[in-house]
Amino acid sequence: MTFRKSFDCYDFYDRAKVGEKCTLDDWDLMRIPMKAMELKQKYGLDFKGEFIPTDKDMMEKLFKAGFEMLLECGIYCTDTHRIVKYTEDEIWDAINNAQKEFVLGTGRDAVNVRKRSVGDKAKPIVQGGPTGSPISEDVFMPVHMSYALEKEVDTIVNGVMTTVRGKAPVPKSPYEVLAAKTETRLIKNACAMAGRPGMGVOGPETSLSAQGNISADCAGGMTCTDSHEVSQLCELKIDLDAISVIAHYNGNSDIIMDEQMPIFGGYAGGIEETTIVNIATHINSLVMSNASWHLDGPVHIRWGSTNTRETLTIAGWACATISEFTDILSGNQYYPCAGPCTEMCLLEASAQSITDTASGREILSGVASAKGVVTDKTTGMEARMMGEVARATAGVEISEVNVILDKLVALYEKNYASAPAGKTFQECYDVKTVTPTEEYMQVYDGARKKLEDLGLVF
């Protein structure tokens, strides 16, 4: 039987009030892991150690497993403790009508985001920025300007303001509203000072409540040509605050960036199981959010990094499969263990850039150095490396990419527990001129030389 109309966030809200009751523990500890394990066994999924898949039959099985995961599990609403289910036709309607391209930014600084494919020769869009990392108020503009000054960077992804007018942006307070507005206003001023006033941005990142996120759409702040973030919860969950934000974004004709970071070793389980959930999450971004694009970010439960062997495999298989069987536009966000001005940080970011570029990602978003949790530990140099490596990787044979990645990850994977802390932006850059130190340039050249030795041609 055909569906009555295309599914939207208002339908989600209505079903979240009447769906099947379920406890949070039952969802997290039983339904998600059991279904993911069942589907892995049903489809015989085995990635055999490949970062980027070469077996299209296995990719098709993975897509079917991810689709089935979303269809049979649905999405858990954490506010009502009920499950929202979609019909198969509603899911296919969303997939078949995915937004195939869009423009970020304005004027000569605008960039066209278009579908890429596995092994594509075109370089992906580089969304450079702190990626939700905490940034001090006094260096908020210089930090973001360091990205806008890099020609490899196409758009900016915002950092989090630790204070606004010296006060913490407490959720649901006037200071959160002020911070949500100020965040993007300062970043756009930074872009203008770099000679790129039309650069698109992705946020807001500081605000945690619906009113904070919605207030970011304002004069001098977020506009409909910027990426507007809404986050799913791990795994296959959402709250009603986010549904309200989605309603605002759709009603404002905003570009919607639906974000979620599946956790390897968490509720979903192992590599194949987490990838199944990741596929379901990608598809849900269309059904629930009507998203323009989905921002991925598989993260390791122990190391808090997106650059481990396991998380790169999840990202590579998920993106390649989504690219092969849908028109969903996908990005990935970067959280290396090491901090700025270290070779390890640059090599970690490079491994993910290689994976994302080769697997068909449309947008690379980063870099949140030092796992994105240390104040002021992020700079434009890491984004430069992300972009240069993407350019060097585009069009390289997948078999060669897998060999390079295996050797590259081996260079740093034994050092997660003792990853170098690195330096703050203030220690890496001249804050007044917004230029990197001689020390950082030497570190950068050293990392680049190691990548060349592995076979990358810059």
From Swiss-Prot:
InterPro entries linked to this entry: MtmB_MeTrfase, MtmB_sf
Enzyme class: transferase
SUPFAM superfamilies: Monomethylamine methyltransferase MtmB (SSF75098)
GO terms for biological process, alphabetical: methanogenesis; methylation
One annotated GO molecular function: monomethylamine methyltransferase activity
Family label: Belongs to the monomethylamine methyltransferase family.
Pfam families attached to this UniProt entry: MtmB (PF05369)
Recorded catalytic activity of this chain's protein: Co(I)-[methylamine-specific corrinoid protein] + methylamine + H(+) = methyl-Co(III)-[methylamine-specific corrinoid protein] + NH4(+)
Record-given protein name: Monomethylamine methyltransferase MtmB3
Pathway: One-carbon metabolism; methanogenesis from methylamine
